[in-house]
């Protein structure tokens, strides 16, 4: 379940640390394929330093496949930009989190993708349906 008292970044890290092996296998396949098109190898979703304290994360740091853009107790913005698209992920917490310590924890994940060109549109054809399976599988760690 979502952990009371844990910041939005903490909730995100908890979820990605429990990334299923099949999701990481999909990321490895994705990274091999996109290199043929000159796109970035993002690594794995759970590529994190397990010893790094939560308070040591700063904007600009890599957090798995994303760059930390903004970090507030109740919301974290993560993103990545490549020549084909830009993505921003928001993890927002209410109730029981660091900003509001009473009540059940509700974690809301929102993703915005800006496609830059035909390559981005082509890329999203297989990626969008896969994300409908991957996102719930990763978020199961939060309950």
Region locations from a protein language model:
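Beta-strand/loop substructures that line and gate deep hydrophobic ligand-binding cavities in soluble
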Residues: 83-125
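A conserved amphipathic terminal alpha-helix motif
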Residues: 122-143
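Hydrophobic-ligand binding "helix-grip"
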Residues: 55-101
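Hydrophobic pocket/interface hotspot
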Residues: 11, 68, 109
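Flexible internal linker/loop segments at domain or repeat junctions
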Residues: 44-59
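Hydrophobic/basic alpha-helical segments enriched in Actinobacteria
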Residues: 68, 104-106, 141
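Hydrophobic ligand-binding cavity/cleft-lining segments
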Residues: 1-48
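Short C-terminal domain-edge/linker segments immediately following a structured domain
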Residues: 27-30, 43, 99, 138-143
């Amino acid at each position: 379940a979502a952990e009371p008292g844990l910041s939005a970044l903490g909730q995100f890290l908890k979820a990605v640390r429990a990334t299923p092996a099949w999701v990481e296998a999909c990321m490895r396949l994705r990274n091999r394929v996109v290199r043929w098109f000159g796109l970035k190898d993002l690594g794995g979703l759970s590529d994190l330093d397990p010893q790094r304290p939560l308070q040591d994360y700063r904007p600009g740091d890599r957090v798995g496949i994303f760059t930390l853009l903004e970090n507030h107790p109740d919301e974290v913005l993560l993103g990545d930009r490549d020549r084909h698209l830009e993505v921003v992920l928001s993890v927002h917490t209410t109730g029981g989190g660091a900003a509001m310590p009473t009540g059940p924890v509700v974690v809301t994940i929102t993703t915005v993708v800006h496609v830059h060109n035909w390559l981005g549109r082509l890329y999203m054809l297989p990626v969008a349906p896969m994300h409908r399976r991957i996102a719930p599988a990763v978020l199961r760690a939060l309950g």
